[in-house]
Amino acid sequence: IIPEGVYIEVVVEGWGLPGSLETSEGTRTGFITVSKVTDKEKIKEFSEKYKVSAVNAEVIQLAKELNAQIVLANEEEVREAAQEAGFQVKGCLGILVDSVKNKILSPRQVIQDIDNLVASGYRIGDDIINGLKETLRRWSE
């Protein structure tokens, strides 16, 4: 489930950028649901309180309205805000690791996905990437 603001930012305004086609296809097939925040005033409050963009505040507010336990976020300030708001936070790498643990993807597939993320501009420290890849290699033995 993603808030309407994320859909607009990623698909409408960001068409052609990484993730736009996948998000569009996910909503078309029903894998991703777009949902509206009911209390729009809270978006402004969260944005000011946590010093995040309105779209990122919308993610946190929608999670609250849906009584979610986990928020998907990669940006550090959004992760911190979501944690402060009481949510467990997962990023792209955490989702990929979970996919191996749940036997959805193989460690080799996830290593390739990590390489693809980095090649497409995903920014994360080399030490984290290298450590994760080493762990995945051990899991594939």
Predicted regions and their residues:
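Long, charged alpha-helical interface segments
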Residues: 105-141
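Active-site-proximal, substrate-binding regions of enzyme catalytic domains
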Residues: 1-69, 76, 83, 87, ...
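Short Asp/Glu-rich motifs
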Residues: 12, 82-83, 101-102, 119
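Short alpha-helix plus adjacent loop in nuclease-associated cores
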Residues: 93-103
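Acidic/polar active-site rim loop that often engages polyanionic ligands
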Residues: 4-6, 92-95, 109-115
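A residue-level structural signature of the nucleotidyltransferase/glycosyltransferase Rossmann-like core
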Residues: 70-71, 121
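Short, ordered loop/turn segments at secondary-structure junctions
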Residues: 76-77, 94
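Short secondary-structure capping/turn micro-motifs that flank functional sites
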Residues: 78-80, 98-99, 116, 133
